[in-house]
A protein has these predicted regions:
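Catalytic nucleophile-elbow at a beta strand-turn-alpha helix junction centered on a G-D-S/GDSL motif
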Residues: 170-195, 216-219
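Secondary-structure boundary/capping residues
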Residues: 207-208, 255
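Structural recognition of the beta-strand scaffold that forms the well-ordered cores
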Residues: 172-177, 181, 208-214, 244-250
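Aromatic-Pro/Gly-enriched surface loop or interdomain linker
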Residues: 199, 213-216
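Extended interaction regions within the primary functional domain
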Residues: 123, 157, 193, 221-223
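N-terminal secretory targeting modules
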Residues: 1-176, 186-188, 204
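Short amphipathic alpha-helices and their capping/turn segments at secondary-structure boundaries
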Residues: 160-169, 190-204, 225-242
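Oxyanion-hole/transition-state-stabilizing segment in secreted/luminal serine hydrolases
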Residues: 186, 215-262
């Protein structure tokens, strides 16, 4: 699994700072495995982000906030639960054992520390609800119902990629696109972007990684929302582990919005 990271405007930030809060986010994976690592990003922010802990857990069939307690797995970073990511930087967790099933929804909960950027590194068009709770005096427990009662936003924060160990014969396709790829017109929390359908079809025959690197409003050359495709290509495509195929589905915003001729 992977997503394209972006600068977060004020309108896409939570109502309150992420400082001393817990944010539960949900991703829909393509294929499964038993060994993985998580990539976190602070690449679009100007201040460090302090993280107290990060843990994974299976959710139920509805892909919501609820987690199955026996599946909770805390990740480490160089052997420690807490980590600080500098501005403009990203990092991987230590490799961890976790039974990940093909096509499942996985919760990733980040417990933030005191220091968080004014503008987080995010992906605006998650088409999936994230659940944020206050934790000033304590860290919210995995099964805490306050996740359901807390603030809800349809964005991902600080998530970049989830790498699953597999053999070299497993194909992985990355998709570079704009809003059509990002999920415009799909149903929030239903995991029905066209790349989700592609993943389902491909994985019906064999394990097949499908990485959605779409950004709504994105352009190829210049303008649009977030960094244009030509600028983000190295990070978002070449920077992904195991990719051996590429779909480029961009250009409509360049044609429709640009005053230049290319």
């Amino acid at each position: 699994w992977a997503t394209a990271v972006e600068y977060t405007g004020q309108g896409d930030m939570p109502k309150e700072s992420l400082s001393n809060r817990s944010c539960r986010q949900i991703v829909h994976v393509s294929f499964g495995g038993n060994v993985l690592r998580l990539k976190l990003s602070n690449e679009q922010s100007k201040e460090p982000v302090e993280i107290k802990s990060v843990y994974l857990a299976d959710t139920d069939d509805d892909c919501n906030w609820f987690v199955k307690g026996k599946t909770v797995k805390y990740l480490t970073f160089n052997g420690r639960k807490n980590v600080s990511i500098g501005p403009g930087k990203s990092l991987y967790s230590d490799v961890a054992k976790y039974h990940l099933k093909a096509g499942q929804c996985l919760t990733i909960t980040i417990d933030y520390g005191k220091q968080t950027p004014e503008h987080a590194t995010s992906h605006r068009g998650s088409r999936t609800t994230s659940y944020i709770v206050n934790g000033l005096h304590r860290t919210a427990r995995p099964m805490d119902k306050s996740f359901d009662d807390g603030e809800k936003v349809d964005h991902w924060y600080n998530l970049s990629a989830l790498d699953v160990m597999t053999d070299k014969s497993t194909p992985v396709v990355a998709v570079l696109g704009n809003s059509i790829t990002d999920g415009r017109g799909s149903t929030t929390n239903m995991q029905n972007r066209w790349t989700d359908f592609l993943s389902d079809e491909l994985n019906a025959e064999r394990p097949y990684g499908v990485l959605n690197l779409g950004i709504g409003g994105n352009c190829v050359v210049e303008g649009g929302l977030s960094e244009p495709a030509m600028k983000r290509f190295d990070r978002d495509i070449l920077g992904q582990a195991g990719v051996d195929k590429l779909i480029i589905f961009e250009g409509t915003n360049d044609i429709g919005c640009s005053k230049k001729n290319y």
